[in-house]
Amino acid sequence: MSERILTINPGSTSTKIGIFDGTEQVFTKTLRHSAEAVGGPLSDQLNIRRQVVLDVLAQEQIDLKALTAIVGRGGLLRPLVSGTYRVNQEMREDLLNGTFGIHASNLGGLLADEIGQTLSIPAFIVDPVVVDELEPIARLTGLPELERKSIFHALNQKAVAKRYAKENGIPYEQLRLIVAHMGGGITVGAHLNGRVIDVNNGLDGEGAFSPERSGSLPVGQLVELCYSTKYKLEEMKRLVVGSGGLVAHLGTYDAVEIERRIDDGDEKAALLYEAMAYRVAKEIAAQSAVLYGQVDAVILTGGLAYSDRLTKAIEERIAHIGSIIRIPGEDELRALAEGVIRVLRQEEQVKEYGGELTWLENSTSLS
C-alpha cells in the first residue's frame, strides 16, 4: 500500500509542510506569512494558508493525486487520549469556532481536511497538546475549585518515547519512561505502559521555568501581584506565558545568545541557566517518584537538548534515576507522518473524535 503523506504544521507566522514516502522525508518547506495574512480570524487564515500551500506544492510539481493521506498538527480540542484521530465534522467545528481555545495549530486539522476532501483522501491529526491520560490522583490539588490539567508537548514526547522503544525492541506499552521536552516551554512527563500518567501543564504555569514561561511561582506572592493593580489580566497571563522565564530576567529567550554571554563571563546569565537546569532536574526527580523509582530511561528532547552545557547540568543531578538518553530537536512533521503510518500499517487503530474515553474510564494502576 502506498504511504505518501502530506504533513502540515501551522505556526503563528508560518506554515511548515512536508512530503513523506513512508518514514522517508522527500520534501519540506517553511512558508512565511505576512502580518495581514495571519491577523484575521481562523476562517480567513484557513483560506489564505490553504491557497499558499497548494501554490507551493504546484510550483514544486508535487503530484497531489499520489497522496495517500494528509495530517495536520492537532489544535486546542477537548481532552483526548493519545493517538491518531480522523478529522470529522465535530472536530472541524471545534477547531474553527475555537470552542476550546484559539491557536494557530487549530488550522492543522482544518487545512488537512479541506485539502483531503478535494482529493477524496483521509485527513488526520496526531497527539495534540490536549492529550490527557492523567491518573485521578494526579489531578487533585489543595483547592476543590482547582484541578490540574494536561497540556504538554504530547506530539514530540510520544514520538521520541516510541522511537526509543522501537530502537530497543521493547513495546512502548511495556516501558516506564520520563520524557523532558525542553524548548520555549518545558514539560516533563511520566510515561507508564504507553500512557502519560502525570505531566506538568506547560501552558498555564506549572513546572520548571523556561526561556519564555514562568513555570511554577510562589502562590502567595503571585496572588498579591494579581491584586496589586500593577497588571491587568491579560498582562498577567503574558507574564506567565510569553514574557516569563529567561526572557524576563535576561531580555532574550535565545539559548545560543545566553550561552555566549555565559562564555563571556556573565554571572547572572550563568546562574539563571543553572537554575533552569536545576528546576528541570527537580521535575524529573518528581516524576521518578510517580513511577515508584522504577525508570527504564530518562529522555531529554526538544531544542534545548542540543545544549551540552544544559544537559550536563541536568544529568549531574539525575544520574541516579536511570539511563539518560538525548534525542534533541522536535521533528514535528516526522512525528505527524509516523502517527499516520502506524494507522496505515494497522499498528494502531484510528480514533474518532467525540468517541474517546474519559480519564476516569481510561485510568490504570500505577504499580
From Swiss-Prot:
Highest taxon above the source species: Bacteria
EC code: 2.7.2.7
Listed Gene3D superfamilies: 3.30.420.40
Reaction catalysis annotation: butanoate + ATP = butanoyl phosphate + ADP
PROSITE patterns: ACETATE_KINASE_1, ACETATE_KINASE_2
Keywords: ATP-binding, Cytoplasm, Kinase, Nucleotide-binding, Transferase
GO BP of this protein: acetate metabolic process
Principal subcellular localization: cytoplasm
GO molecular function per UniProt: acetate kinase activity; ATP binding; butyrate kinase activity
UniProt cross-references to InterPro entries, sorted A to Z: Aliphatic_acid_kin_short-chain, Aliphatic_acid_kinase_CS, ATPase_NBD, Butyrate_kin
GO cellular component, one term: cytoplasm
Protein location: Cytoplasm
Enzyme class: transferase
Pfam families: Acetate_kinase
NCBIfam families: butyr_kinase, PRK03011.1-5
Family that this chain belongs to: Belongs to the acetokinase family.
The protein's name: Probable butyrate kinase
Originating species: Exiguobacterium sibiricum (strain DSM 17290 / CCUG 55495 / CIP 109462 / JCM 13490 / 255-15)
